Amino acid sequence: MRITLGNTLPPYPDFVEGIRRAPDRGYTLTPAQTITALKNALRYIPTEWHEQLAPELMEELRTRGRIYGYRFRPAGDLKAKPIDEYRGQCIEGKAFQVMIDNNLCFDIALYPCELVTYGETGQVCQNWMQYRLIKQYLEELTQEQTLVIESGHPLGLFRSRPDAPRVIITNSMMIGQFDNQHDWHIAAQMGVANYGQMTAGGWMYIGPQGIVHGTFNTLLNAGRLKLGIPQDQDLRGHLFVSSGLGGMSGAQPKAAEIAGAVSIIAEVDSSRIETRYRQGWVGHVTADIAEAYRMASQAMQRREPCSIAYHGNVVDLLEYAERERIPIELLSDQTSCHAVYEGGYCPVGLTFEERTRLLHESPEQFRHLVDISLHRHFEVIKKLVARGTYFFDYGNSFMKAIYDAGVKEISRNGVDEKDGFIWPSYVEDIMGPQLFDYGYGPFRWVCLSGKHEDLIKTDHAAMECIDVNRRGQDLDNYNWIRDAEKNQLVVGTQARILYQDAVGRMNIALRFNEMVRRGEVGPIMLGRDHHDVSGTDSPFRETSNIKDGSNVMADMAVQCFAGNCARGMSLVALHNGGGVGIGKAVNGGFGMVCDGSERVDEILRSAMLWDVMGGVARRSWARNPHAMETSEAFNGSHARDYQITMPYVADEELIKKIVPYIVGK
């Protein structure tokens, strides 16, 4: 048997009107590289079609900057179906088809025709030939095999064993010398590199809900830490301003409303505003800055949650507030600055349509305008912060982009970015010490039956596993899952996000598998965002609160990936650059199918704890106080099977005496 694209050449598709399309990514290959790129694409395609398709694929490369193989895209909307409607030899093979189609459905994907799920450039795979082959391989996959995916390319099925992963994915794992945006762009054009973001290429995206709990936690804790809001109160009467209503950033208005705040979120793309408004993730829309702030002021006076989408550029929005002396309490940004020169950041003064056209016609001019806009963006934030605004980078490489645009003033040491920037990232100030250091992170699950009643049952089961008296974080998480149904978070298939620590995740996972075993619910996919305690190494986000010098090391993410492979997670993924861009992060994730078996129970008992505690242990070794407390307690409660190496903490006064003396000599 040979897996192929079949014997019938599909017709060229009619693109659905109103569905967003990715901009031209830029064609910059040499003639020799172009020849290789075309050969690379044609190797998926039977030779009898080459003469007809070679000019077509070449035109895609020339005009889109990528070869997508549009002809091979299945017609219509690729909505996730109930698992029983997919063909397969094993449950995992069918389950991952659910996840892939969910990543690419019109309600979820940013650019469905270009396989981009979210984050401007985050793809499931590179082209539709790969998609078709992956689907066929998943249909043939057995419990004795593992499917290997390398930057979207299905390398094939390889014999393994039932307690090994069914799918292993890597994306854009480039050699160090070439691990930069320029060389990656060449590799992507040539069809050998896929930017998987995090859960796009890791097949684990669940719509904007996937980040909304983390955003809710961030805003709530920012209010507690910086605005003095008591633990038992929310953000009523307080204003949050940011930008972006895309696949991840679109969580901001919903999270702010759930936290009780008033929010104004700037977005230049009207289609993204329309999507979030239609889905109920933003309450009001205006293109008038004065009206946006007026609506916000009225809602604050009434102490009512309110979300406002401003159709325009965030720089204009902030400069108006600075000029009119309108106080902004909490400020962030979620433009796609990991791809700042590829369209992820729209320069002030350009409409979204002008941005798209300029990207195609004059990428160098576009780059120049981005740099000018970033300078203005920096200057207005600096003025607002001086007046009392709390600004935090939301891990989108925003401050790194400003630094790269030539604003060295933004670096903390005035020399380079190794010590971070003058304003903290949300992980550095909030999520790191308050959540990651304890092991809390974005646990998630998908009810593969597609039944809403299964989701409600799992919500209640998860709620019963949380001890609200243990920590304040547990009470927040309990309230979150209690209100999840009321807050109407589902976009796409039936899924849920819930921040939990290591033991919490394991207990919930075991409870779910027991429910599947008893026939109370259908099979369940467990997973998490790569943006988690252990899953990602990045000094610009996930490990920005690690101060022992190891924030530039990627050992943790790689060990997490390898450990999850060894313990038998159903899917394991390792990527380059998730969230912050190529060369700036190494990130990984997993998927685990709960089929009700005792085999899965054993994997959950081992893998769920490892997946979290490996990161807590690393944070503890960096001398993060809460991680040290958590590791010490874990050593006591799990002494039979685990032992985390604990650091001895040096006396600060001793170090202050010794170092100046030696350096002075």
At which residue positions do the language-model features occur?
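N-terminal ligand-binding/catalytic initiation module
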Residues: 1-214, 220, 224-227, 231-232, ...
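Catalytic cofactor-binding cores of redox enzymes
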Residues: 101-113, 186, 192-199, 217, ...
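Structural alpha-beta junctions
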Residues: 140-145, 260-261, 327-330, 383-390, ...
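General beta-strand structural signal in soluble alpha/beta enzymes
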Residues: 146-151, 169, 242, 265-266, ...
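Catalytic or ion-translocation cores adjacent to nucleophile or general acid/base/metal-coordination motifs
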Residues: 197-220, 224, 236-239, 245-303, ...
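Short, solvent-exposed amphipathic alpha-helical segments in soluble enzyme
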Residues: 257-259, 322-327, 407-411, 516, ...
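C-terminal domain-closing interface element
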Residues: 295-304, 309-324, 328, 626-664
